[in-house]
Amino acid sequence: MRPSNRTPAQTRPITITRQFTAHAEGSVLVEFGETKVLCTASFTEGVPRFLKGQGQGWVTAEYGMLPRSTHSRMDREAARGKQSGRTQEIQRLIGRALRACVDMKALGENTIVIDCDVIQADGGTRTASITGACVALVDALNWARGKGIIKSNPLKFLIAAVSVGIYNGEAISDLEYVEDSAAETDMNVVMTETGKIIEIQGTAEGEPFSHEELIELLGLAKNSIREIVDVQKAALN
């Protein structure tokens, strides 16, 4: 039995609220149960120096957690003077995932910076960030097309992400914090809207997991991501 009484394959309630802030070209509040992340997409003309003159764009991401997004207050990383390894790993993951769904040539020499700020954390912040950031990215691209900055739609497909794991010997989807902290296996999966894999991050926290369990976890992730993409599409429509 899961602490929330969810079935093994059941995700938490997921909501996506677009245009959550006034200034960003794309702005989304994404909620996976009690995990809440603000995702903004900022569109700027021009690209980093290493891409100048190549006729293609760039998508990158930054990630952070507010001091009281967790049960006890943590210091801001800016106050500590450096980002943690975890933060760097997560923002690179978000950036890689989003670059997979954008045609950089169609984007032209323009840059989109995604900022994912965790307001409240209850497990799955990186997967929620990717899911919300994709919708914010779509809005930023539509803004640029509306302004005539880009001519064609650079978006190749929607992407979404979910955590899966083995908890009390059972494969489950969309782990909340109490499950994540006690899971025997923890995995983050990013897929396209058609179920193709973009990235898998999987670790055996206790006992090693079998090939059969891996296939079961990926099947759970695929089904959950299909449902999450439906939420994205409903928000965009």
UniProtKB/Swiss-Prot annotation:
GO molecular function: 3'-5'-RNA exonuclease activity; tRNA binding; tRNA nucleotidyltransferase activity
Subunit field text: Homohexameric ring arranged as a trimer of dimers.
GO biological-process terms attached to the record: rRNA catabolic process; rRNA processing; tRNA processing
Name by which UniProt lists this protein: Ribonuclease PH
Substrates-to-products reaction catalysed: tRNA(n+1) + phosphate = tRNA(n) + a ribonucleoside 5'-diphosphate
Lineage: Bacteria, Pseudomonadati, Pseudomonadota, Gammaproteobacteria, Alteromonadales
Binding site for phosphate: 86, 124-126
PANTHER family membership: EXOSOME COMPLEX COMPONENT, EXOSOME COMPLEX COMPONENT RRP41
Highest taxon, organism lineage: Bacteria
